[in-house]
């Protein structure tokens, strides 16, 4: 029979936990419910002892982030400063480049005038060379000493025109102890004293240096580095060594006055002038025959047994390999 008091005791025991459920029902009626709510194979997360010992609080993580941000900021500050300096330098360089471009644009016309300036310079050099030998080219002056002294006594200064003569009254007047002479007159006397050694025979035929004589001959020759330029140099050197450079130049001008050109005059003199008869052409050492002036390369021939200048052999080129070629006109 149903005993209400017993059931009350059982209920109180179950509620208080003094009486186990298995003792009353034999099996736990909630066991199936537990198994249904808790799937098979589900295992709770477990932390390793090493991880549990570490601090994983939010404050530590935030602090680490702040430290990283501060470090990055300290690194970026000098980088930003350097970038600013680089930008400033680039700006200055850009300005300078623009200024250089403007200057180059301004000097471009000057660069284009290079050929013109070179031609003017060459013309001026030739003109100065001719001016230095003006007396030689034009012959003797005819200004008498009396006219020079008369002009000096009247005006007190030498005349502007050149006056070269043997009897120099102005020289005696300049070095006189009793006469007060101006500086211009003294300078004129010093310059004229340099030609006192010239005589009537040697005045129009002075002994020029080989270089000056060759430069005078070049003014009559067309082109550059032609065989006739080499011939002019060789003849000038031989004439200078023999002391007949003045006579050679006088003979050259004489042939030109007859209507011949400079090439014909040099060829004629090389075969008729006494200083060149039987003269042996000089030997010029070169690295190879390609270094010989291009206009002369077509005139190179095999060296004959006894070459002489009066037979048209100008010079002999000797290469480093031991080969020889003669320049023939």
UniProtKB/Swiss-Prot annotation:
Keyword flag S-adenosyl-L-methionine: no
Repressor in keyword set: no
Domain VP35 IID: 204-329
CDD domains: V35-RBD_P-protein-C_like (cd21030)
Alphabetical UniProt keywords: Coiled coil, Host cytoplasm, Transcription, Viral RNA replication, Virion
Main location: virion
Source organism, top-level taxon: Viruses
Quaternary structure and interacting proteins, as annotated: Homooligomer. Homomultimerization via the coiled coil domain is a prerequisite for binding to L. Found in a trimeric complex in which VP35 bridges L and the nucleoprotein. Interacts with NP. Disrupts innate immune signaling in infected host cell.
UniProt name for this protein: Polymerase cofactor VP35
């Amino acid at each position: 029979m149903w005993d209400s008091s017993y059931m009350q005791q059982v209920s109180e025991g179950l509620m208080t936990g003094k009486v186990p459920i298995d003792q009353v029902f034999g099996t736990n009626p909630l066991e199936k419910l537990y198994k249904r709510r808790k799937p098979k194979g589900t295992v709770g997360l477990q932390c390793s002892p090493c991880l549990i010992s570490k601090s994983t609080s939010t404050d530590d993580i935030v602090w680490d982030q702040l430290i990283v941000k501060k470090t990055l900021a300290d690194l970026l500050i000098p980088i930003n400063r350097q970038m600013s300096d680089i930008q400033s330098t680039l700006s200055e360089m850009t300005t300078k480049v623009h200024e250089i471009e403007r200057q180059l644009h301004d000097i471009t016309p000057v660069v284009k005038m290079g050929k013109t300036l070179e031609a003017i310079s060459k013309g001026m050099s030739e003109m100065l060379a001719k001016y230095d030998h003006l007396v030689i080219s034009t012959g003797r002056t005819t200004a008498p000493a009396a006219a020079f002294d008369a002009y000096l006594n009247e005006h007190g200064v030498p005349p502007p025109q050149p006056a070269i003569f043997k009897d120099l009254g102005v020289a005696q007047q300049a070095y006189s102890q009793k006469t007060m002479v101006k500086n211009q007159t003294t300078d004129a006397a010093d310059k004229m004293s340099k030609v006192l050694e010239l005589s009537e025979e040697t005045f129009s035929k002075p002994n020029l240096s080989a270089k000056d004589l060759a430069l005078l001959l070049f003014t009559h020759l067309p082109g550059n580095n032609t065989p006739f330029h080499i011939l002019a140099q060789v003849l000038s050197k031989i004439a200078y060594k023999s002391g007949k450079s003045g006579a050679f130049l006088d003979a050259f001008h004489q042939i030109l006055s007859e209507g011949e050109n400079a090439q014909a005059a040099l060829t004629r003199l090389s075969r008729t002038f006494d200083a060149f008869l039987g003269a042996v052409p000089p030997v010029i050492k070169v690295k190879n025959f390609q270094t010989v002036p291009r206009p002369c390369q077509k005139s190179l021939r095999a060296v004959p047994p006894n070459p002489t200048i009066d037979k048209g052999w100008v010079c002999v080129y000797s290469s480093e390999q031991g080969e020889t070629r003669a320049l023939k006109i």
